[in-house]
Regions:
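Acidic donor-binding loop of glycosyltransferase active sites
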Residues: 87-101, 114
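Conserved acidic donor-binding segment of nucleotide-sugar-dependent glycosyltransferases
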Residues: 130-142, 151-155
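Short hydrophobic beta-strand element within catalytic cores of glycosyltransferases
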Residues: 106, 115-119
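A charged, aromatic-enriched C-terminal amphipathic alpha-helix characteristic of glycosyltransferases
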Residues: 139, 155-177
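Donor nucleotide-sugar binding/catalytic pocket of nucleotide-sugar-dependent glycosyltransferases
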Residues: 1-23
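Conserved active-site histidine-acidic residue motif and adjacent donor-binding/catalytic loop
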Residues: 39, 60, 69-88, 97, ...
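Short alpha-helical segment that forms part of, or immediately flanks, the ligand-binding pocket
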Residues: 83, 106-111, 125
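Conserved donor-binding/catalytic core segment of Leloir-type glycosyltransferases
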Residues: 25-43, 49-55
Length: 177
């Protein structure tokens, strides 16, 4: 690529150590979506704060109109807490235009048994034909009713497929494969 000798390239894909992530077949919050990531403009969390059933976790940055005083913002989780509690949710969302490949947080969600609702930029190496992977088209990001409908549809499917989702995550994104 770009003139590099491919025999001397080593690609190290991003992945998650699935054994570190707590997994439950029945989530504690099956009707809730987790939006996990640094609060910043490219991830557009500020657009989705009015959607009931979405909780936001991540380091707050004052570069966006996201209101950190709302009940739906849970602050930043410590790593060990994240490992234990990602599995509590029905699914995860990430609608960002600044991703190069599938972000680690999406792979973590899958190994924890969560379906995902993502942008095409966050779905690089996901099998988008799977019923628990929903890709929101660019022209629908600001259509809050559409996004909410897709979150609900994905959650309903995802909470019934937790074992399959986890297995897909382990088979495709775990360091253990």
């Amino acid at each position: 690529r770009d003139g590099a000798n491919v025999d001397k390239l080593l690609v190290c894909p991003n992945g998650a150590q699935h054994r570190d992530y707590h997994f439950t077949e029945k989530p504690l919050k099956p009707s809730w979506t987790l939006y996990l990531g640094r609060i910043e403009p490219r991830k557009r969390q500020y657009l989705y704060q009015d959607i009931y059933g979405v909780e936001f976790v991540g380091k707050y940055t004052d570069t966006t109109s996201f209101d950190r005083n709302r009940d739906c913002y849970l602050g930043q989780w410590e790593h060990e807490y994240k490992l234990q509690h990602v599995t509590d949710y029905g699914n995860m969302m990430l609608l960002s235009d600044g991703e190069n490949g599938t972000p680690l947080v999406i792979k973590e969600a899958l190994v924890a048994g969560l379906g995902v609702v993502v942008s095409k930029y966050a779905a690089h190496d996901l099998d988008t034909s799977l019923p628990f992977v929903t890709v929101i088209p660019d022209d629908k990001w600001e259509d809050i009713e559409y996004v909410q409908m897709k979150l609900i549809e994905n959650r309903k499917i995802s909470v019934t497929m937790r074992k399959e989702i986890r297995q897909y995550g382990v088979d495709n994104f775990s360091w253990q494969k």
